[in-house]
Amino acid sequence: MAKHLFTSESVSEGHPDKIADQISDAVLDAILEQDPKARVACETYVKTGMVMVGGEVTTSAWVDIEEITRKTVREIGYTHSDMGFDADSCAVLNAIGKQSPDINQGVDRADPKEQGAGDQGLMFGYANNETELLMPAPITYAHALVKRQSEVRKAKTLPWLRPDAKSQVTFAYEDHKIVGIDAIVLSTQHCDSVSQADLIEGVMETIIKPVLPAQWLNKDTKYFINPTGRFVIGGPMGDCGLTGRKIIVDTYGGMARHGGGAFSGKDPSKVDRSAAYAARYVAKNIVAAGLADRCELQVSYAIGVAEPTSISIETFGTGKVSEEALIALVRQHFDLRPYGLTEMLDLARPIYQSTAAYGHFGRNEFPWERTDKAEALRADAKL
């Protein structure tokens, strides 16, 4: 039997890079709410006592960048200067300008269906059948741990928790089937008064055990809870944060390839985001249809051109039909032009802030997680 380990990590909504992602997507949502056809590329930088919001926007909307920023930081939980970051006293700098007309002329068309891609690039979508969500287990449970940390913190179940946290989970596999969890890392920011012993017990009993399936834990599973022994200074006081620096956390935890483009702060005309969502939609429906146990789809674009420049599929030896047949089915059932995929997934609306923490995939509230094409794919594959 072939044995291997695979590790994925996640970070909480209070991690500096995720603060930046959430602010960028909060700005995007506020603009799309007023102007669904807006062009938005919003980048955020956070550091002790300050937030800088920049980028390029073309819109008829007006939004209050400062108020959106403060509200987002407040909801995350940075509300007092003893955390090193306070929503009500931090400086907010606005450096947003207009989108280049050179880009705009390549994207907009008289016929909306011929809308060109907002940039060149390559995107990947992935699905497998090792969880009910058709997502890899390591990233799924890494997200679940930090999401649980946030829930426990906001409920004040463990009142010494602070917003910044990271998780990492190592799964053991035999012949690509999960046989257990080898190691768990959870580091959480905390107030100065809690003892290491109380912290370890609280995290184990209140965060780790309720989240991870008991059948995957055994006497050899290793636990690393705040392994440095102290994590009082965190958030933007500990590290600066930037939009788009957690692209592997945002996607498949490293189990699939990545085209390099970040998601947050980008409207659906940016195929870095919208085509990656569509690629996940395609891959998930292929796996849901039983056409493969694992599926990775790559799609690529040229700026100003509507049709993808390439579509390729890898099923890692698990496909029930040829990859050429799968590509033909994809072309038949999915419109991967920028306008088509925006319509197919109803992307021109304010749904993005909630994507900006705990992963963009494997969450059934999002339209790219539907499996409504699976039955038709299976029928046309004649399985």
Curated annotation (Swiss-Prot):
Where, in this chain's numbering, is ATP bound? H15, D164, A165, K166, R230, F231, D239, R245, K246, A262, K266
Annotated pathway? Amino-acid biosynthesis; S-adenosyl-L-methionine biosynthesis; S-adenosyl-L-methionine from L-methionine: step 1/1
User: Where is this protein found?
Assistant: Cytoplasm
Record-stated family: Belongs to the AdoMet synthase family.
- Protein name in UniProt: S-adenosylmethionine synthase
Which residues take part in binding K(+)?
Answer: E43
Q: How is the cofactor bound?
A: Binds 2 divalent ions per subunit. Binds 1 potassium ion per subunit.
Query: Could you tell me which InterPro entries the record lists for this protein?
Result: ADOMET_SYNTHASE_CS (IPR022631), S-AdoMet_synt_C (IPR022630), S-AdoMet_synt_central (IPR022629), S-AdoMet_synt_N (IPR022628), S-AdoMet_synthetase (IPR002133), S-AdoMet_synthetase_sfam (IPR022636)
| Any Gene Ontology CC annotation | cytoplasm
Q: Alphabetically, which GO biological process terms does the record hold?
A: one-carbon metabolic process; S-adenosylmethionine biosynthetic process
